[in-house]
Amino acid sequence: MSKRRRKATFKAYNPDQLSLLPPSLEDLIPANHVVRVVRSVIDQLNIDNILKKYKGGGASSYHPKLMLKILVYGYLSNTYSSRKIEQSVQSNIHYMWLAGMETPDHNTINRFRTEKLKDVLKEVFAQVVTLMVEQGLVDIKTIYIDGTLSLIHI
């Protein structure tokens, strides 16, 4: 009795296959992904203090909410380097979705962080935390360590 070896079969694979329509980034991101929370919270922020820092004339700028979204998501993903955030905006679907397929470079990201957020970062952070608490996304508890007020996520 001889055993015939069966030939392995594989699913069709053609990386060069064209498709009629490219997939929507919206369809590729799960409904419960944290990137959706970032987008929702940043969209609700009052950014008047940031908008005041922009002067009229010259080349158009990336919208401050776009820049905040990619920075906040970067920080949540432990990505702090403007160069790494730039790379992510070009290659990671979550960043692409947040940025609406816009691609700010590392210099633009860094200038936004150092110039536009310079005096308002604490206010922006406070708004983000407040919105997240109001929406039940986080619970905070006040604790004191060595006399320092700290907020922790429970």
Language model features: what each stretch is:
Residues L76-T79:
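Alpha-helical scaffold/interaction cores of sigma-54-like transcription cofactors
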Residues H33, L68-I70, I85, D105-I109, ...:
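Short, conserved catalytic/metal-binding motifs centered on acidic residues
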Residues V129-M132, L137-I145, S150:
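Structured, charged N-terminal subsegments at the starts of enzyme catalytic cores
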Residues I93-M96, T108-M132:
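Short, basic alpha-helical nucleic acid-contact segments in DNA-binding proteins
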Residues I152-I154:
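Conserved small/polar residues in nucleotide/adenosyl-binding loops
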Residues P30-V72:
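Basic, short loop/linker segments at the boundary and entry of helix-turn-helix/winged-helix-like folds
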Residues M1-I42:
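Charged, often Cys/His-bearing segments associated with DNA-binding zinc-finger transcription factors
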Residues K84-Y95:
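DNA-recognition alpha helix
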